[in-house]
A protein has these predicted regions:
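Non-catalytic DNA-recognition/assembly elements of restriction-modification systems
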Residues: 1-36, 124-137
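A short beta-sheet element
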Residues: 34-36, 44-101, 110-113, 117-122
Length: 137
C-alpha cells in the first residue's frame, strides 16, 4: 500500500496555537482543546474549520482504548499540547482522524515521565494514500 507523510497531506497549523492558563481563561461557549480533548470553554476562538488534533504531549500514547487524535469542527481554541492538522484537498478529515487515532507511536515519542510527539517526528508519520472514494468507505 502506498503511504504519504503527514507534512505532505496536511497543513500543520501549530504556529497558531495559544495556551491560556486556567486563571486567565474567560468563560465562554467555545471549546478549549488540549492533548486529550476539551479542557474548558472560553470566550473567544482561534480556529473555525474542520481539523484533526493530534496529541503532542500528555497524550494517550500506547493506549489501545483511548485515542491520540480527534476531530474538531467549527469555532474553537487549541492549546500547545495538541498538534493542529488541516487536511489538504484530496484527504478526508474523518479518514485522517481515523488513521491517527490509535497510531503506533512506539519509537516516535520521547520523555520518561511525560511522553512527547515532537512536530519534527509528527511531520514524518505515514498514513495510507488512498483515493478519496476509498477514504469514504
Amino acid at each position: 500500500m502506498e503511504m504519504m507523510l503527514l507534512e505532505e497531506c496536511c497543513e500543520i497549523l501549530d504556529s497558531m496555537r495559544i495556551p491560556i492558563t486556567a486563571s486567565n481563561r474567560k468563560e465562554g461557549i467555545y471549546p478549549y482543546y488540549g492533548a486529550n480533548g476539551i479542557q474548558d470553554h472560553v470566550a473567544d476562538y482561534i480556529f473555525d474549520d474542520e481539523l484533526v488534533l493530534l496529541a503532542e504531549d500528555g497524550g494517550n500514547f500506547g493506549s489501545k482504548t483511548r485515542p491520540i487524535a480527534y476531530r474538531v469542527s467549527g469555532k474553537c481554541w487549541v492549546n500547545n499540547h495538541a498538534h493542529v492538522l488541516k487536511p489538504k484537498e484530496g484527504l478526508n478529515v474523518d479518514f485522517l482522524c481515523y488513521s491517527l487515532m490509535f497510531y503506533n507511536t512506539e519509537g516516535l515519542v520521547n520523555g520518561a515521565t511525560r511522553q512527547k510527539l515532537t512536530q519534527t517526528t509528527m511531520r514524518k508519520m505515514l498514513i495510507p494514500n488512498l483515493s478519496i472514494e476509498n477514504q469514504l468507505y
